[in-house]
Amino acid sequence: MGCGLLAAGLLLFTWLPAGCLSLLVTVQHTERYVTLFASVTLKCDYTTSAQLQDVVVTWRFKSFCKDPIFDYFSASYQAALSLGQDPSNDCSDNQREVRIVAQRRGQSEPVLGVDYRQRKITIQNRADLVINEVMWWDHGVYYCTIEAPGDTSGDPDKEVKLIVLHWLTVIFIILGALLLLLLIGVCWCQCCPQYCCCYIRCPCCPTRCCCPEEALARHRYMKQVQALGPQMMEKPLYWGADRSSQVSSYAMNPLLQRDLSLQSSLPQMPMTQMAAHPPVANGVLEYLEKELRNLNPAQPLPADLRAKSGHPCSMLSSLGSAEVVERRVIHLPPLIRDPPSSRTSNPSHQQRLNAVSSRHCDLSERPRQRHHSDFLRELQDQGMRPWAPGRGELDPHWSGRHHRSRPSESSMPWSDWDSLSECPSSSEAPWPPRRPEPREGAQRRERRRHRSYSPPLPSGPSSWSSEEEKESLPRNWGAQRRHHHRRRRSQSPNWPEEKPPSYRSLDVTPGKNNRKKGNVERRLERESSHSGRSVVI
């Protein structure tokens, strides 16, 4: 009986240490949420009676049976949850993927699994698993298993669910791309405001940006055009050549006198002002170019612009800086040898006769001037005078028969000295020049005096001089001129009261010659039917 009691006590003593030293594994979190490319640490700890160098720690990976994120709202998942089951982990290993992540014995270095050798994974402390740069396929259930020799009882493993939010990472990537595009757009708008209107300062392009340099330069130019636009539209611009070129070409080439007179008689067209600024800021340059292309200088001036402009500007006054521009029109008398009746009867015959006589006079102008100067010199040497002394009428000896033989001939405007007597018509044959006799010269001069009322040429300024030339003369010039005329009147005959000059000058000066211009124009219109040639200066 004593031996039986001893055996029972020995059995009880051996059982108690074995129950107290059984294996126990614990984990801190059963679920962990992590984003893609993040780092995570899965905590695991254990207690055992075995030696630490003999303990083997193993981390296994098992994929989810059903995804706890995408399959959470499915009917099967919700039904399993209602029954108290875990649909994400309640399946056999044959239905999911199983991998060994890492394994370590005692305090030695961990050994990674075949699928994780290129990964940054390690085991720290007693049994903590550290994963750097979590990938999307790390999404699953991790089991921490402890193997200790001699410990056959207890719970040797615990599970931890690692939920990788890879879909959230994808969303973050998409949002980041959108933010990047928005940032690029803000920078684009800040540097290239001709495409959009953004008022957010962007530090990515303080001086340069990705927009084209041509578009940026064009935008700056359009800003300058908009700033200078109102100043350019204040006064109209006129078309035509400059003043210096017109004057020089007119002086060098007399054939341009007729064209210049026609151009000066027509009012110049100002540039058509823009009705309104274009609504789009970047179309100002195109609008200006379109207006310049569509501009027609030949079209008439609008009524409103005509009322504003007042009198039309000529070719010279519209472009030059001078405010007063003078234009003189000189009308020359006709070169006609027919009586007045034939002159008024057939105008076409008069024009042909003028052309023939003027052409012949131009050819024989120089010989006639030379013979006339010789005749006057000879007449002065002989002391012969065609006027009677002390009287203002012609000497009867010089009047002769010629004055009585042509008493009915009407007076006509004075022309060139020898154009009426020595220029033959087309039907007459030319004769060689000869020196006239003194009596013949006196009779011819008396006949010319009877035809014309023009006095001798004065010594002062000519009748067609401008107002500026008259103003430039000294103030006592009038008294000197009257004294000079009294001296000449004592030596020359008294001319009639009405002695219209043959050369008329029309001074067109805006502002100060308006009253004088009316009388001169009326007298000019009455004599314009008798003039044969007009010259515009």
From Swiss-Prot:
Subunit: Homooligomer. Interacts with MARVELD2 and OCLN; the interaction is required to recruit MARVELD2 to tricellular contacts. Interacts (via C-terminus) with TRA2A, TRA2B and SRSF1. Interacts with PLSCR1.
Source organism, top-level taxon: Eukaryota
Cysteine-cysteine disulfides: C44-C144
UniProt protein name: Immunoglobulin-like domain-containing receptor 1
Positions carrying Phosphoserine: S490, S492
Any one Gene Ontology cellular component term annotated for this protein: bicellular tight junction
Function: Maintains epithelial barrier function by recruiting MARVELD2/tricellulin to tricellular tight junctions (tTJs). Crucial for normal hearing by maintaining the structural and functional integrity of tTJs, which are critical for the survival of auditory neurosensory HCs. Mediates fatty acids and lipoproteins-stimulated CCK/cholecystokinin secretion in the small intestine. In the inner ear, may regulate alternative pre-mRNA splicing via binding to TRA2A, TRA2B and SRSF1.
Composition bias type Polar residues, residue spans: 341-357
Organism annotation: Mus musculus (Mouse)
Keyword set, alphabetical order: Cell junction, Cell membrane, Cytoplasm, Disulfide bond, Immunoglobulin domain, Membrane, Nucleus, Phosphoprotein, Receptor, Signal, Tight junction, Transmembrane, Transmembrane helix
